[in-house]
Amino acid sequence: MASPGSGFWSFGSEDGSGDSENPGTARAWCQVAQKFTGGIGNKLCALLYGDAEKPAESGGSQPPRAAARKAACACDQKPCSCSKVDVNYAFLHATDLLPACDGERPTLAFLQDVMNILLQYVVKSFDRSTKVIDFHYPNELLQEYNWELADQPQNLEEILMHCQTTLKYAIKTGHPRYFNQLSTGLDMVGLAADWLTSTANTNMFTYEIAPVFVLLEYVTLKKMREIIGWPGGSGDGIFSPGGAISNMYAMMIARFKMFPEVKEKGMAALPRLIAFTSEHSHFSLKKGAAALGIGTDSVILIKCDERGKMIPSDLERRILEAKQKGFVPFLVSATAGTTVYGAFDPLLAVADICKKYKIWMHVDAAWGGGLLMSRKHKWKLSGVERANSVTWNPHKMMGVPLQCSALLVREEGLMQNCNQMHASYLFQQDKHYDLSYDTGDKALQCGRHVDVFKLWLMWRAKGTTGFEAHVDKCLELAEYLYNIIKNREGYEMVFDGKPQHTNVCFWYIPPSLRTLEDNEERMSRLSKVAPVIKARMMEYGTTMVSYQPLGDKVNFFRMVISNPAATHQDIDFLIEEIERLGQDL
């Protein structure tokens, strides 16, 4: 095994012993390279010498002289202790990298420089003195940079500049003061896993092309089903491109379970189907209904209480109404952690109703599923074990890098029967291994990204207790924020009571509005406060928090905490920053 000090740039011989007898030189290599045709020799010499004289090119101007960078050594020892020679990327293009002949050294040099750019960005992401975003309006970015695609290739110096520019204007989602979305933070193990996944660059449809990843998906989904509460982790599941697709999978499977003929005959052979979900549920239920031909009018929205929880009596009433009209209720989607309020529907009561009327029960726990990792908070999902299917997004509350969403199904084989098409060029039945590990035919997609490795590697690094600590910390920070602002001058809570999740919903009331009566004029003026403060946050780059209206409530801030880097001091900063930016409104 090579010692830790052998370094990134070392090239091991086949037996790992190295060869110290033939040191070689850049000059010797350059002389050999001149025998190659097509300009390869000149490019290799430029690579070896860096600041050497540029080769002449007929019929065109010379590229601008670029800063030389250190690259792989010029000797042939494996490993060696030579100092790295200079690389001038103005002479190099993507065609000089692997799999090009002699592309190893420029490839290592290029990827090392890309890695340096990425690592600098990672470090800056956690620096509170840096901006969350260097905001520019779309027309400014379009005018300042040429983003158009060209017919001719650019050199690698320009490619590296594009990498830097892209990250310069990207949102630092790992910044401790980024609270804008449900998915925040930047986990180092998850990041490493994502790099590995991209390097492996394989598909998830069969065991033969993704043996380890397929097994990890099997192990991880089984563990998630155990945590849900299904005996022995039995059932099925798949990682999908996001919670919206996971929810649509659930609708497809529920429909197939009730009417398996839909797979061949389509919706024309079915009665009108009706799905039920709360008025605070995610819009993906209606999108799924539209995509599946069920229609958005066939998604009935159930009333919620003042905390955003589905009212079971209204659910039962609407089911009976649909049945009286001759419609067929086929799915109830309860939400465990709504997007805005963070509400948890009463799953036990919903399960009783679904059992009574023989309706598929789905739980959209995309946001709230992470609480199942916490012994302190998992009670909020009591009844999830009675669901027929569950959506769970580890890329939200568990901090796994995007994307990582799972659909879990209680009945094994149902997903396969619903979606399989028996493509013989992929799913041959006479393979030499257990075909149950060829999982691709149960997916809607053919090409499917490897999403499991990030979650699996983070789970190995943290353990279940590590995820639990993260969840508990985030909910404690949410309660800390709530306790500060609930009685603070200039703040009004959108609903009474401490947060159910990490969602803290509130209005900031500027001094000019604090003495006004609670009437239409005040509401109209208040609706403009959050958008202006949010715009100022982005222009200063200090923090980011989302806002939205909901029902008859005008724009309010929705603070969500899933960022592992956030601390009590960041919550204090947020409050002070909102007051600073909104004081004059």
From Swiss-Prot:
Which residue ranges are recorded for the region named Disordered? 1-24
UniProt superkingdom: Eukaryota
Lipidated positions per record (S-palmitoyl cysteine): 30, 45
The EC number of this protein is: 4.1.1.15
What GO molecular function annotations does the UniProt record carry, in alphabetical order? glutamate decarboxylase activity; pyridoxal phosphate binding
Show the ranges annotated as biased composition (Low complexity). Answer: 1-14
Q: Which reaction does it catalyse?
A: L-glutamate + H(+) = 4-aminobutanoate + CO2
Q: What does UniProt say on post-translational modification here?
A: Phosphorylated; which does not affect kinetic parameters or subcellular location.
* Residues the record lists as N6-(pyridoxal phosphate)lysine modifications: 396
Q: Name one Pfam family in it.
A: Pyridoxal_deC
Binding-site residues, substrate: 181-183, 558
Physiological role: Catalyzes the production of GABA.
What is the official name of this protein in its record? Glutamate decarboxylase 2
Organism, as annotated: Homo sapiens (Human)
